[in-house]
Regions:
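Short, polar loop motifs at secondary-structure junctions
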Residues: 32, 127-130, 183-188
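Short alpha-helices
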Residues: 183-251
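Active-site cofactor/cluster-binding pocket
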Residues: 140-195
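Short, hinge-like loop/turn segments at secondary-structure boundaries
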Residues: 61-62, 111, 139-143, 198-201
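Hydrophobic helix-and-loop "lid/oligomerization" segment in the mid-to-C-terminal part
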Residues: 75-97, 105-135, 149-153, 234-300
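Charge-rich, low-complexity N-terminal segments
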Residues: 1, 5-72
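Short beta-strand segments
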Residues: 94, 157-160, 182-184, 231-233, ...
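Short glycine/serine/threonine-rich phosphate/pyrophosphate-binding segments
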Residues: 101-107, 164-168
């Protein structure tokens, strides 16, 4: 029996198979002559349907991927998120456009977590430049603008935002069918087809990353603690905003124990300003006027 792969429409395939079967006698005689054998067995042609099965499987997989993309985000726990990180080897990390301290600090926190896990192929993309205040964070040099050609990766990790479209140009690097893990503390349903930890009880995405270190059983390095402390203090306003809770202070204590230089970091984040910022502040103060016995101030 000879199995042959046939291409074309159904009628074309039938016609090809009929032609092969009609030529079976000639093929048999030619084989006998060329191989110089006394007896040549009967030759029967049959269609090889394995390719059809492959094509069918491809269609099934395409349907599954499409259903996954349209499915609501799958909420998972921190332990499962840690297992997801361990199970991948190549990563794409990103956050929202116009990144703040929580966005950059959380992204770098995940970067240091992956490095501590022994992962080496990590791409960090942010659509906008890293603000000057955060360019000296440990690992910030790993952050780049989106590549024209999406890199190969197994898992995308999106921090401090729950929807890919808010990552700007990085969204073009987030390939369909690739796994996506979201770590966010804002209320929302999250990216369809992704999985994630979204918990608004955390004051900052950086706090979720701290909890992820614990779930993964990985100690927080001084470098990671620095980044995550910046993430926390920027989103809590130095622990002055109403989102600050008892857990926030416990997390802060954990980061301090990991080696954070709190006074130095707070000075750099809250008290150091650029020359243009200083000039703007000077202009605002120069034009300030007081009303209502000094209880109201306005400027222009």
């Amino acid at each position: 029996n000879v199995y042959v792969s046939l291409f074309g429409s159904e009628s074309e395939r039938k016609s090809s198979l009929t032609g092969l079967r009609n030529s079976a006698g000639w093929v048999r005689r030619e084989l006998g002559k060329r191989l110089r054998i006394r007896y040549t067995p009967e030759i029967r042609f049959f269609p090889d349907e394995s390719l059809d099965q492959v094509y069918h499987l491809e269609e099934v997989f395409d349907e599954i991927h499409e259903q996954q993309r349209e499915a609501p985000m799958l909420g998972i726990g921190l332990a499962e998120a840690a297992d997801t990180l361990r199970g991948a080897e190549r990563f794409l990390l990103t956050t929202h456009q116009n990144p703040d301290g929580d966005a950059i600090g959380s992204l770098l926190g995940v970067y240091h977590l992956l490095r501590a896990m022994g992962k080496t192929e990590i791409h960090c993309f942010v659509d906008d430049p890293v603000p000057r205040t955060y360019t000296n964070l440990p690992g910030a040099q790993a952050i780049a603008r989106p590549a024209e050609e999406p890199p190969e990766y197994d898992l995308a990790v999106v921090v401090d935002v729950a929807h890919a479209e808010r990552t700007g140009a990085v969204a073009d690097c987030l390939l369909p069918g690739k796994a996506m893990l979201i770590l966010d503390h804002h209320l929302g349903e999250g990216e369809r087809g992704a999985m994630g930890v979204i918990d608004s009880s955390y004051a900052a995405a950086g706090e979720i990353v701290v909890a992820l270190f614990a779930a993964a059983g990985v100690p927080i390095s001084p470098e990671a603690a620095h980044c995550l402390y910046v993430a926390q203090i920027t989103d809590t306003g130095g622990y002055r905003f109403s989102n600050t809770n008892a857990r926030s202070h416990r997390i802060a204590a954990e980061l301090l124990e990991a080696g954070v230089a709190a006074a130095e970091i707070c000075c750099e984040v809250f008290e150091c300003i650029s020359r243009p910022q200083f000039e703007l502040l000077r202009l605002v103060l120069d034009r300030m006027e007081l009303e209502a016995d000094g209880r109201v101030a306005h400027t222009w």
